[in-house]
């Protein structure tokens, strides 16, 4: 089991990498794990019957919101975008053929059949995949390359999370301009109002309304399926598009221009990564059932219906989705589309929260405020700082780009870049985790990369049209995450070198007669084998120790969850000292007071430890970092790291420590 430094450190744990925090500060010394490893959580039998149906409907509301709203703008971009083709019969059949085979190959074949098998104890997503393959890499260079690759993929996902709410809501509200052209100027203001309310609502949590997300998307998929069937019945010849020959002849006929149309076709698979990222919430089977049983058939019917409309009326390319609806159903369709767009946006926002939580626990992001909005659902969280950054960026995109067509140019690069990163990491899973031979793994990887790279290159030409935005956003996030990781590792190394081994300290305490005072003192340390500097400072300056001293280490591991029976190890060190080591996965948030309160109820092999809250004082270190130290990090990165450390959430708040029971002791460190 690979242990990673718990994200704690800089401005919050005494001069030592307080592991009790996940970024309690920039340090975090990975100490040898006191346990040999963790058992796999008990596997529940695959859901069946009503349970499977309920999970599948739930998956519709979370997993398929992004890809489910793609019909609002995908074909409009293929035929009416800056690189669109004229909607002749041959081109319509060719584009629809590409749409069908893109959905079949990328979503059904690549993600459903292969990538979803590469789970990190049930969890999926870029960071979970990176943590999974990182366990098998033994060389320093190899781990560094995997880290950089995974962080850039995660950074691209943030760009996706910014664009999706903007383009989905814009695409839905643009139906108003179809119903009443005079209302076109109201599209952007209406979109802004909806997004403002959406982001303001986040602090309330989705526990109360989350139950309706699935039914809303169920109605949405039923609606688009009916609209599609209506279009197909008007011109059934569109079904010829299912033949791959039409896609191939499209490229032969249009050449380079036809290749560029892939930049619009890729919009039909923009939610593919969500299938993998949300795997831990619903499980593989419900996600597959929802896709094959409803989502894919409904999407395919709607795209074919739009294609049939274009065969009959090429002028409908300006907005084929809404023009597919009969006039009397236009406003109800707009309402349902807007509701679906809000659900899709919520799914991406919640995904950004989850991704940030993972990054914090894995040590790639400074601490931010994490609020649990549901007592029953552990995954229901709200991150105020992330929410406001996403909200501000989304509103800026809407005001800057104005239309979903312009935003579509920015969308594809983030999605296709993430797909390439996933393929490269998945190759390592096949080779290192599954033991596939090169002759078996490389052909599949090459096939995936050929398709991914084709979509990516077709979108690169849109760089000046808006593609620069996700690249800029990803570069910014990547710089922040990599800077935090480098700075934290450097600080951890400095603190480790300056630390004192625990066994030597305990031998010294046993020899010396230090004055003791009543009560319990809790010291946080990220290194179970060392003494936290804050304890040394306390002893040096105050020259006393409490009757009972508890050293708490919270270690973050590269697995999503830790089984409760394996959560805690405790032992008595002698002279009134106790050591508590707690283990957490990257999907969990530690609560130190609750952890200590639970000790008497746990069946621990070590001593029975009872903590009286009003007789307990928590000691934390607060480091003041200076950029003039000996580490080989560039000065600009040191300064950026220091700014991030200063603005990180305090360790006491992150660990839920009672403010009136916390004592902080400062130290100056030259980084």
Swiss-Prot record:
Subcellular location per the Swiss-Prot or TrEMBL entry: Cell inner membrane
Membrane topology: Multi-pass membrane protein
Source superkingdom: Bacteria
Disordered as annotated region, ranges: 1-43
Presence of keyword Nucleus: no
InterPro entries reported in the protein's UniProt record: K+_transporter (IPR003855), K_trans_C (IPR053952), K_trans_N (IPR053951), Kup (IPR023051)
Keywords attached to this entry: Cell inner membrane, Cell membrane, Ion transport, Membrane, Potassium, Potassium transport, Symport, Transmembrane, Transmembrane helix, Transport
Annotated transmembrane regions: 52-72, 92-112, 147-167, 181-201, 209-229, 255-275, 291-311, 323-343, 381-401, 407-427, 441-461, 465-485
Catalysed reactions listed for this entry: K(+)(in) + H(+)(in) = K(+)(out) + H(+)(out)
Gene Ontology CC: one annotated term: plasma membrane
Biased amino acid composition, Low complexity: 10-37
Molecular function as annotated in GO: potassium ion transmembrane transporter activity; symporter activity
Family in the record: Belongs to the HAK/KUP transporter (TC 2.A.72) family.
Function text: Transport of potassium into the cell. Likely operates as a K(+):H(+) symporter.
UniProt protein name: Probable potassium transport system protein Kup
């Amino acid at each position: 089991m690979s242990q990673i430094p718990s994200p704690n450190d800089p401005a919050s744990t005494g001069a030592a990498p307080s592991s009790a925090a996940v970024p309690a500060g920039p340090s975090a010394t990975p100490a040898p794990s006191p346990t040999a490893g963790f058992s796999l959580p008990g596997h529940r039998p695959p859901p069946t019957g009503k349970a499977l149906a309920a999970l599948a409907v739930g998956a519709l509301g979370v997993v398929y919101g992004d890809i489910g709203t793609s019909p609002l703008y995908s074909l409009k971009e293929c035929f009416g975008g800056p690189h669109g083709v004229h909607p002749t019969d041959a081109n319509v059949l060719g584009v629809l053929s590409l749409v069908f085979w893109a959905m079949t190959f990328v979503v059904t074949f690549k993600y459903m059949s292969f990538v979803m098998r590469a789970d990190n104890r049930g969890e999926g997503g870029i960071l979970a995949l990176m943590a999974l393959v990182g366990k098998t890499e033994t060389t320093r260079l190899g781990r560094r390359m995997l880290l950089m690759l995974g962080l850039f993929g995660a950074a691209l996902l943030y760009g996706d999370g910014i664009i999706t709410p903007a383009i989905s809501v814009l695409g839905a509200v643009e139906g108003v301009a179809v119903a009443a052209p005079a209302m076109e100027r109201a599209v952007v203001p209406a979109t802004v109002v909806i997004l403002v309310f959406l982001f303001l609502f986040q602090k309330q949590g989705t526990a109360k309304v989350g139950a309706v997300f699935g039914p809303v998307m169920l109605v949405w998929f039923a609606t688009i399926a009916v609209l599609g069937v209506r279009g197909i019945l008007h011109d059934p010849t569109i079904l010829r598009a299912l033949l791959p020959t039409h896609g191939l002849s499209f490229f032969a006929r249009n050449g380079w221009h036809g290749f560029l149309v892939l930049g619009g076709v890729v919009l039909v698979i923009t939610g593919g990564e969500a299938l993998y990222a949300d795997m831990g919430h619903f499980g593989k089977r419900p996600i597959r059932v929802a896709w094959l049983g409803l989502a894919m058939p409904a999407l395919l019917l709607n795209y074919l219906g739009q294609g049939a409309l274009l065969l009959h009326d090429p002028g409908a390319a300006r907005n084929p989705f809404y023009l597919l609806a009969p006039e009397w159903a236009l406003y109800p369709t707009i309402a349902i589309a807007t509701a679906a767009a809000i659900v899709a946006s919520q799914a991406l926002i919640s995904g950004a929260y989850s991704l940030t939580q993972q990054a914090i626990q894995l040590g790639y992001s400074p601490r931010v405020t994490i609020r649990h909005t549901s007592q029953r659902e552990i995954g229901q969280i709200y991150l105020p700082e992330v929410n406001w950054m996403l909200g501000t960026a989304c509103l800026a995109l809407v005001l800057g780009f104005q239309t979903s067509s312009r935003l579509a140019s920015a969308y594809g690069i983030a999605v296709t870049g993430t797909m390439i990163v996933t393929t490269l990491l998945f190759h390592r899973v096949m080779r290192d985790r599954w033991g596939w031979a090169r002759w078996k793994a490389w052909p599949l990887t090459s096939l995936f990369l050929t398709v991914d790279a084709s979509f990516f290159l077709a979108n690169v030409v849109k760089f000046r049209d808006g593609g620069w935005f996700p690249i800029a956003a990803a570069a910014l996030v990547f710089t922040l995450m990599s800077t935090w990781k480098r700075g934290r590792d450097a600080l951890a190394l400095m603190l480790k070198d300056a630390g004192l081994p625990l066994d030597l300290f305990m031998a010294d305490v046993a020899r010396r007669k230090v004055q003791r005072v009543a009560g319990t003192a809790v010291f946080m340390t990220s290194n179970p084998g060392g003494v936290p500097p804050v304890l040394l400072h306390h002893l040096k300056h105050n020259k006393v120790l409490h009757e009972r001293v508890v050293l708490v280490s919270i270690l973050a591991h590269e697995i999503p969850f830790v089984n409760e029976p394996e959560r805690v190890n405790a032992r008595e060190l002698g002279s009134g000292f106790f050591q508590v080591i707690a283990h957490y996965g990257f999907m969990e948030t530690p609560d130190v007071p609750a952890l200590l309160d639970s000790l008497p109820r746990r069946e621990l092999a070590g001593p029975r430890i009872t903590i009286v809250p009003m007789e307990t004082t928590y000691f934390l270190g607060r480091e003041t970092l200076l950029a003039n130290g000996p580490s080989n990090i560039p000065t600009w990165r040191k300064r950026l790291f220091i700014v991030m450390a200063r603005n990180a959430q305090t360790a006491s708040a992150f660990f839920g420590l009672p403010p009136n029971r916390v004592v902080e002791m400062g130290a100056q460190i030259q980084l």
